[in-house]
Amino acid sequence: MLQVTPSQISGIIESGGVVAYPTEAVYGLGCDPDNDTAIQKLLAVKQRPWEKGLILIASSFDQLKPYIDLSRVTEAQLQAAFDKWPGPFTFVIPAKADVSPMLRGCFDTIAVRVSAHQDVRAMCYACQKPLVSTSANLAGEQPALTLAEVQTQLGDKIDAVVLGALGQSCQPSTIIDIQTGHIFRQG
């Protein structure tokens, strides 16, 4: 399995690759959110149905703007997200109409997070866009916590793994509906 630094992944992502990388709590799997073929590959690797949707991670809110429908979100709702970001909080926000169903799943919303993890931020900065993010594991299995676990579960099905350390969190991100405040998952 190819091992790269966060700044080296842009070419892999641009060519439709799927990479594993460290996040705040577990290893994640990512790809280009604007490439449906790459998203389909990621879903096949993970054995995850597209209908569930995926998360976008970013180094800044500006990277997320092309994917979210700001006309359906109030300033107060946005401020609630800004108060938590960067950090382990994912917000479910109305998606723009042209966002691929491969990202949204069967919803008109998209889950987004501005990460505080140094390597995630460096990857998004290098790619100049957010990345698709889901835990690095086969559906129904425990998320990978080590490079060895990534190798065991995903092996040669992915294009590269980003070298780096997991963050200090023991929990996945909290997922919150930005419009209602409903917590889908407590982190």
Curated annotation (Swiss-Prot):
Q: Which UniProt keywords apply?
A: ATP-binding, Cytoplasm, Nucleotide-binding, Nucleotidyltransferase, Transferase, tRNA processing
Q: Where in the cell is it found?
A: Cytoplasm
Any one GO BP annotation for this protein: tRNA threonylcarbamoyladenosine modification
EC number(s) per entry: 2.7.7.87
SUPFAM superfamilies to which the protein is assigned, alphabetical: YrdC/RibB
Q: Name one GO cellular component term.
A: cytoplasm
Keyword Nucleotidyltransferase on entry: yes
Q: What catalytic activity is recorded? A: L-threonine + hydrogencarbonate + ATP = L-threonylcarbamoyladenylate + diphosphate + H2O
Residue ranges of every copy of the YrdC-like domain listed in the record: 3-187
What Gene Ontology molecular function terms does this protein carry? ATP binding; double-stranded RNA binding; L-threonylcarbamoyladenylate synthase; tRNA binding
In terms of InterPro entries, this protein maps to:
DHBP_synth_RibB-like_a/b_dom, Sua5-like_dom, TC-AMP_synthase, TC-AMP_synthase_SUA5
> According to its UniProt entry, what is the function of this protein?
Required for the formation of a threonylcarbamoyl group on adenosine at position 37 (t(6)A37) in tRNAs that read codons beginning with adenine. Catalyzes the conversion of L-threonine, HCO(3)(-)/CO(2) and ATP to give threonylcarbamoyl-AMP (TC-AMP) as the acyladenylate intermediate, with the release of diphosphate.
Q: Which HAMAP family match?
A: TsaC (MF_01852)
Q: Which family does it belong to?
A: Belongs to the SUA5 family. TsaC subfamily.
Protein name stated in the entry: Threonylcarbamoyl-AMP synthase
Q: What gene is this protein a product of?
A: tsaC
